[in-house]
Amino acid sequence: MGDPRRLSKTYDTPNHPWIGERIKQERELSNKYGLSNKKEIWKMETRLRTFRRQARKLISDTSAQGEKEAVQLFGILNRYGILLKEDATLDDVLSLNLESILERRLQTLVFRKGLANTPKQARQFIVHGHIAVNGKKINAPSYLVPLVEEDAISYMPNSPMASESHPERTDSVKDAE
């Protein structure tokens, strides 16, 4: 089978490890979104950085190919619900912040939909296999949910959480059903 290739990191670490303000901001984000470690923040920052880098490159590119790439970038950002403006510009891409990407994670959406009481509980439900998207079990809390799949987030049908009488189910979900 051969040796698997060495996978490259999907994130960049901070340049300086002990900047108090950055540590404080990361702790607040970690608590707000129920993240388990700083690496999850760094992965999303890197993803945001690539979008912004591409937008900066496209601002200076006035060719037809640059126009096509800008339309593709807007398509990706619209598909994931990160940038929802119809008449978005590349300046709007540059003004995106980390929270706009963190809001599209499966863990955050499970909590926002009321399927879990806290972001940490949402993470636990996802990791333990209680959450499905379009009927398919997703066990990665960092899964970026496209807009078309957002309404299809639910409990797995064969999960104990699917039972209305389960003690861990939230009151808002019991009332909705």
Curated annotation (Swiss-Prot):
Signal peptide residues on this chain, from the entry's feature table: none
Keywords (A to Z) from UniProt: Ribonucleoprotein, Ribosomal protein, RNA-binding, rRNA-binding
GO molecular function, one term: structural constituent of ribosome
GO biological process: ribosomal small subunit biogenesis; translation
Taxonomic superkingdom: Archaea
Location of region: Disordered: 157-177
CDD domains linked: S4
Pfam families in the cross-refs: S4
Domain S4 RNA-binding as annotated: residue spans: 104-168
Xref: SUPFAM superfamilies: Alpha-L RNA-binding motif
Residue intervals passing through the bilayer: none
Record has Cell division as a keyword: no
Biased composition (Basic and acidic residues): 165-177
GO cellular component: small ribosomal subunit
PANTHER family named among the record's database cross-references: 30S 40S RIBOSOMAL PROTEIN, 40S RIBOSOMAL PROTEIN S9
Subunit architecture: Part of the 30S ribosomal subunit. Contacts protein S5. The interaction surface between S4 and S5 is involved in control of translational fidelity.
Known function: One of the primary rRNA binding proteins, it binds directly to 16S rRNA where it nucleates assembly of the body of the 30S subunit. With S5 and S12 plays an important role in translational accuracy.
UniProt record similarity statement: Belongs to the universal ribosomal protein uS4 family.
Protein name in the entry: Small ribosomal subunit protein uS4
The species this protein was found in: Methanococcus aeolicus (strain ATCC BAA-1280 / DSM 17508 / OCM 812 / Nankai-3)
